[in-house]
């Protein structure tokens, strides 16, 4: 069964200031926790469009949200294609959009998906099972330099060179097929003192490969840029991030959007066209409460940022 602890459930949806008759988007359906809470706030005129590129997530959400079937439309697509998918359905603007950028726990926990460094499985890591690029391709075919780049940039891994070198050495003997083999390579490459602290030694490398396979950071940037253009005045976007790379992208995009164009010097009054279109609804990111952290350890690194389109 598709189980997923929803992080910052109330905060994320409540910060959207949901209108009962509004049109909303859940860009990351996952376990449908946020969607369910949001649908509860809509009347018969309100509607939710829920996106996921994982068919399993959609199939399970259809069962979970069966009572709301007339108020929700499920769309199997990467959220970077959200604007086009909504436009195709006649939707040009929406009242709110939410993102939960954590990988759904079921995807991490399903052995055959190849995300987990705790269980041996084929190297896969695709969110969209119809996509061609897999973790096996990255590990066996990407150059030494590209592996260093993704391990360092996406995993913030100190031992990127050592791990890439060991991968290169092993794959010359035979292809690297499984997550277990990759974990063994990582453990060989990382010096013993470093292996003993900071959680599982494979954590950063696996994160880096997953981000690369799914082009996660590129998709986040594309999607958020389009999301800003979809908002009605007064509408809001809530974004939960789980690591510094996504948070940096979100923070920079939001700051850029709230700046407004450069002003000519010496203006006594700022004309409307020079006023920014957006304002931050959260000066500092909202983080989970101690109570939530006790119940769900995966929420530890979560940060929620919210932006609002200004009514002019």
From Swiss-Prot:
Keywords: Cytoplasm, Methyltransferase, rRNA processing, S-adenosyl-L-methionine, Transferase. GO terms for molecular function: rRNA (cytosine-N4-)-methyltransferase activity. It is found in: Cytoplasm. GO terms for cellular component: cytoplasm. S-adenosyl-L-methionine binds at residues 32-34, 52, 79, 100, 107. Its EC number is 2.1.1.199. It catalyses: cytidine(1402) in 16S rRNA + S-adenosyl-L-methionine = N(4)-methylcytidine(1402) in 16S rRNA + S-adenosyl-L-homocysteine + H(+). It holds the Pfam family Methyltransf_5. It comes from the Bacteria. GO terms for biological process: rRNA base methylation. PANTHER family: 12S RRNA N4-METHYLCYTIDINE METHYLTRANSFERASE, S-ADENOSYL-METHYLTRANSFERASE MRAW. Specifically methylates the N4 position of cytidine in position 1402 (C1402) of 16S rRNA. NCBIfam families: 16S rRNA (cytosine(1402)-N(4))-methyltransferase RsmH. Belongs to the methyltransferase superfamily. RsmH family. This is Ribosomal RNA small subunit methyltransferase H. The gene is rsmH.
